[in-house]
């Protein structure tokens, strides 16, 4: 009994030492990006007793810690008072590292609410992000689209975002997107003393037709066989290797490939935009990426630049090309290690990056278009001064497993004089795109029960067996080609996939000998024409 009484007296004495008012607490809803998805972050601000100081906890990085100075100056320049005493800011959940300056605005609003300089009951209804300038202006931040999608999933009324990010957030249906120019405007809106019209986007008008000055296949003189090969590639989603001397138009043709691909669907556009948003590639006022990306990294690109990485993993070029085209010019000049690590993304459509900070998976479903010279000095084999061994070593910089994932090997010959001077207009990209879309529609109907198979290039062994059947004469032709033309065994499935696409372009139900014959001609390296 005596021990119990002593414990009770000690507890009463300890409680009596605490001040009656330990400060005011405010909570602001925000969010942060992990990979290409966002997760909710609760910004807790407590204005308490003690010496005037600001402490930020919850695994903030350097940019978040620096927000103390930005916020304090922005508060003063907005006409507010900097809270006296100890201000503690917690970014929850505390076990996930927080990056970037996007917490400036919610921290500042939380400090105003905790110090009773504003009165509002709206902090729980909006997700708030934004970087503060020293003048108290609100600057744009990265990753607003995934943050808006998270706000929608959390059932929030809307988001308070920098005005330059408002269009990006407004593509999310059913969400009030409030654009703010400065801290005072945001505070007065939450108090209800200032009205701000939500930004709205008409998604039906976002997907504009291609502008008249867009790149077009009609601008390319000659190279009809290469245009045909790229049409087949676009129709089936096949990867392509263009082989030819300098000046034959390889880059010019590759840059025009996106103009014959089917338009992005809304889900594709949202996923593509999320990737570009978190990297900061969206232009001010841009809501969605509505055209298929075309990325062309230099051959000196690092592993992290091409595949993604850094200390805190971010998307690389292969993810920025998601749902679009990745063009690798001078393919043999890329580091072999970089090319080899591309094999998994080419096969699976995503890339997984492991770092000390965590493991991230980024989408990477793209069409690979690579280009290379036929020999080290760029000349055709019969004109080259390189020895057969030098040519062989040059070609062998591209490994067999990587070639396994490239369906079409296309020779790009020099353009003839009569083709350069031909005044007749070439076929427009729009006409070619119509045929490509018709072939894609046939594939969508064929694979409607297999959502992971989006086009012929994505077929596995089961799909090839089911939809690439050959009659006896056609099988004999393929057998002859494999033997007589010295085709490698790895070419077999690729030829069947390409032949299926050629049949789809022709509107044919079955693969014929003509379709197989054309597919065989598109396997130059397997025919080993350079020894």
What are these regions (language model features)?
Residues 244, 308, 330:
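The Walker A (P-loop) glycine that initiates the GxxxxGKT/S ATP-binding motif of P-loop NTPases
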Residues 129, 328-331:
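Hydrophobic residues in beta-strands of the RecA-like P-loop NTPase core, especially within AAA+ ATPase
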Residues 242-281:
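Walker A/P-loop
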Residues 287-305:
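Inter-Walker segment of RecA-like/P-loop motor cores
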Residues 2-241, 245-251, 354, 491-492, ...:
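Peripheral, non-AAA+ core regions of ATP-driven protein-machinery
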Residues 231, 293, 304-325:
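Conserved alpha-helical scaffold flanking the Walker A/P-loop in AAA+ ATPase domains
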Residues 57-68, 83, 90-100, 312-313, ...:
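Basic, amphipathic alpha-helical bundle interface domains used for macromolecular binding and assembly
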